[in-house]
Amino acid sequence: MEQRLKSERLKTELITNVSHDIKTPLTSIVNYVDLLQREHTPEQEREYLAVLDRQAHKLKKLTVDLVEMSKASTGNIPCHIARRSVRELIDQTVGEYAEKLSAARLEPVVTLPDEELYCLCDGALMWRVLDNLLSNACKYACAGTRLYIAARREGETVAFSFKNISRDALNIGPDELMERFVRGDSSRTTEGSGLGLNIAKSLVELQKGTFSIAIDGDLFKVGFALPRTE
C-alpha cells in the first residue's frame, strides 16, 4: 500500500513538474510572438528573436531528454559493449567541457592510476553518462570550487566518482534526488530538465554497471562502477 501511494505521488509530481517545464518556455514564446506582431524597432526584433531561439532550444532539449529517459528506463537503446580506455573516456569528455567548466568557474581535478585502466562499456552511452554528470556539475556546483573526477580499479570493476560542492543547500535525500524531474534547487530556477541523473543511472545499468549518489552536507558525490577488463 505504501509503495503504491509513493508511486502515485511520483506520478503526480512528474506531471506537475513536466507541465511547469513545458509551460514556462511556451508562455515566453507566445508572449514574444505577440510582441513581434506589434510595432517594434530592429533592435527589439533581434532581442525578441534571441529569446524565442533560446526558449525553443529549451523545449527541444526537454523533448530529447524525455525521449532518452523513456528509452533508457525501458532498456530500449542499442548497447554495443567493447573494451574502452578509461583515461581516454574521461580526458575526451573533460576536454570537450573545458569552456563550460570555465564559464561555471569550476576547476576539474582528475585523478587516475598510473597504469592503464580499461572498462567494458558502450562508447556512445558512456559519453552520455559523463555528459550528463558534467552538465549537472556546471548547473549546480558552487562557482569557484573544484570538481573532483576519479577512476580506480576496484575488484573486477572500474569505480568512477564525481565530487563537487553544491551551490544550493541539499535538503533532500539521495533517493529523492535521483527521481525524475527533481533538481538540487527546489525553486526550479536553474535551467535543465532534472532528468540528467536519472538518465545517467539508467544508462550505466544498461551497461551492466551500478550507480549511486551520496550527500554529506553540501558535498555531492556520484559513484558508478562498470565491469573491468585487461
Model feature map: region roles:
Residues 169-182:
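Short conserved segment of the HATPase_c
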Residues 40, 74-79, 118-121:
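Conserved micro-motifs of the catalytic ATP-binding
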Residues 144-156:
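Short beta-strand/loop element within the Bergerat-fold HATPase_c
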Residues 51-59:
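Short alpha-helical segment of the dimerization/phosphotransfer core of two-component systems
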Residues 208-209:
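Conserved glycine-rich
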Residues 80-84, 107-117:
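Conserved catalytic submotifs in the C-terminal HATPase_c
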Residues 137-138:
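Short helix-loop "hinge" at the ATP-lid/N-box region of the Bergerat-fold HATPase_c
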